[in-house]
Curated annotation (Swiss-Prot):
Organism, scientific name: Trichodesmium erythraeum (strain IMS101)
NCBIfam families: rpmF_bact
Spans annotated as Disordered: 1-58
Sequence ranges of Low complexity compositional bias: 20-32
Protein name per UniProt: Large ribosomal subunit protein bL32
Molecular function via GO: structural constituent of ribosome
Length: 58
């Protein structure tokens, strides 16, 4: 089994962890923004049926 030769420093570990957390924070922000735009029917990134059209079909 492969074993690292030296211990990873705290600063390097903290930088990697901070990078990972920032990526997760950005993904959550984008998901929330997309959810809000879909909720307010202002989304242009994908096609979805309008609520008015669904009500007319019933």
């Amino acid at each position: 089994m492969a074993v690292p030769k030296k211990r990873t420093s705290k600063s390097k570990k903290n930088m990697r962890k901070a990078n990972w957390k920032n990526q997760a924070k950005l993904a959550a922000k984008k998901a929330l923004s997309l959810g809000k735009s879909v909720e307010t029917q202002r989304s242009h990134s994908f096609v979805h049926p309008r609520y008015e059209e669904e009500e007319e079909e019933d």
